[in-house]
Regions:
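Beta-strand/loop nucleic-acid-binding surfaces
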Residues: 342-366
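A non-catalytic, helix-rich entry segment at domain boundaries
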Residues: 68-179
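Structural detector for short beta-strands of small beta-barrel domains
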Residues: 314-344, 373
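Nuclease catalytic cores
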Residues: 27-77
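Flexible glycine-rich surface loops and low-complexity tracts that mediate binding to linear polymers
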Residues: 325-329, 359-394
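OB-fold nucleic-acid-binding modules
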Residues: 304-324, 393-394
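Mg2+/Mn2+-dependent nuclease catalytic core
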Residues: 174-268
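Cysteine-cluster motifs in flexible loop/terminal segments that predominantly coordinate metals
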Residues: 32-36, 269-313
Length: 394
């Protein structure tokens, strides 16, 4: 889909329906805003493509860091978490090759952005070397704590992931007892359409522990996610996990679930799935406004959001600020901007550099536009289209 065609999209060609099975992240996304989930999973244009997410430098860099850290911890976990500097440790580090992995991931993202209809203005803030250095700092700090205060993995056999994948139809508790560890193990609830991929399940002093490593801030929702995964383990294997554990930089959040805890959480899971099915049965689904709206990738399609925006006069915004603005072009645009009218009658002066105007223009008198992430200048009151701004026809 070309940028010219993309920015003229007004609604989906084919509306998304509820998925056959839900994940923890999809349930959370639907609960946050059913319309947002529906719009991001609907099909658009004559070729019925999914709506492309707006790339964000911070999120791309975060994904790269998380991916490499995850590969390092996974590889070292399968080697029973050897000590820093040991032969097994060095062998693992060389195999993962963090520097080359980062370079490959950066190249992959750059290629994707080059062909992305919303890739204008995208630049990573950190170089490949800076990303690698950041990963090494985080990894050294976290790995030392894991080894010193971590799990007893002495009983784990050294194995390749394929050994488990070829036996995934077996009882997971049997596999856990056989190998001592399961990595990225997928489980599906037998009665509720819910699926999860357990990053790390191990035997710690003969106790079953479900573990997840997080590089961000501590969040109670992370333990709740593992509690849902504990339900899957319980229902598939018949065994209640002894412990669930989220490992952060410098901290560990643990919970020791009982059967009663799992039964209560399972009822919540069942209700959430039913609620998600109901919410997605409407086309369009109902929106749920909140702090997430300003970062929503599909807010240009949400009439409720723009209705709320109309209630905030442009002149009431203090200081220089990034704004979303719905306007009607008053006169044909020049190479540097145009005058426009905001719903409600307020006038606005939209300005831009010629290069930016070429991307989203030409702008004709009477056109109805929804502008995302423009810069409202406090000194002049002008609204400037920046390289990261977007302009959609309504």
């Amino acid at each position: 889909m070309t940028p010219a065609a993309f920015y003229k999209i007004k609604e989906p060609t084919r509306w998304a329906i509820a998925p056959d099975v839900f994940s923890y992240s999809s349930l959370n996304a639907i609960k946050r805003c059913p319309l947002q989930w529906q719009l991001t999973h609907s099909k658009y244009g004559d070729d019925e493509q999914l709506f492309p997410f707006r790339p964000s430098p911070s999120s791309v860099e975060g994904d790269i860091i998380h991916t490499v850290l995850e590969r390092l911890f996974r590889a070292l976990s399968l080697q029973r978490l050897p000590k820093l500097g040991s032969p097994d440790f060095r062998e693992c580090i060389q195999h993962v090759n963090a520097k080359k992995t980062v370079e490959d991931l950066v190249k992959k993202h750059e290629e994707r952005i080059a062909a992305h209809p919303r890739g204008n203005g995208f630049r990573l803030r950190l170089t490949s070397q800076q990303l690698t250095n950041k990963i090494i700092r985080i990894f050294r700090q976290q790995y030392s704590q894991v080894v010193e205060n971590g799990l007893d993995l002495s009983s784990i056999q050294k194995l390749a992931c394929q050994n488990i994948e070829s036996e995934e139809t077996l009882d997971p508790s049997f596999l856990l007892n056989k190998y001592g560890l399961l990595n990225e193990y997928k489980l599906k609830h037998p009665n509720i359409p819910f699926v999860g991929i357990l990053d790390f399940v191990c035997l710690d002093s003969e106790q079953t522990v479900i573990v997840d490593f997080k590089t961000g801030k501590q969040d109670e929702d992370h333990l709740r996610q593992l509690l849902y995964y504990a339900i899957l383990w319980w229902r598939v294997s018949g065994q209640v996990p002894n412990r669930i554990e989220v490992r952060y930089l410098g901290n560990v959040a643990s919970f020791f679930p009982t059967k009663l805890d799992l039964e209560s959480a399972e009822e919540e899971m069942k209700n959430e799935v039913a609620s998600a099915f109901r919410a997605l049965s409407e086309k369009p689904a109902q929106p749920s406004l909140g702090s997430h709206c300003s970062l929503c990738d599909v807010r240009q399609f949400c009439d409720t959001y723009w209705g709320e925006r109309e209630k905030v006069p442009l002149d009431s915004i203090d200081g220089t600020a990034v704004v979303d603005l719905e306007v009607v072009v008053s006169v044909h645009a020049s190479d540097y901007g145009f005058d426009a009218t905001i719903p409600g009658g307020e006038n606005a002066c939209i300005v831009f550099e010629p290069g930016t105007g070429c991307i989203y223009g030409p702008f004709a008198s009477g056109e109805h536009l929804r502008i995302l992430s423009a810069l409202r200048k406090h000194e002049t009151g002008e609204v400037e289209l920046k390289p990261w701004s977007e302009v959609f026809r309504v």
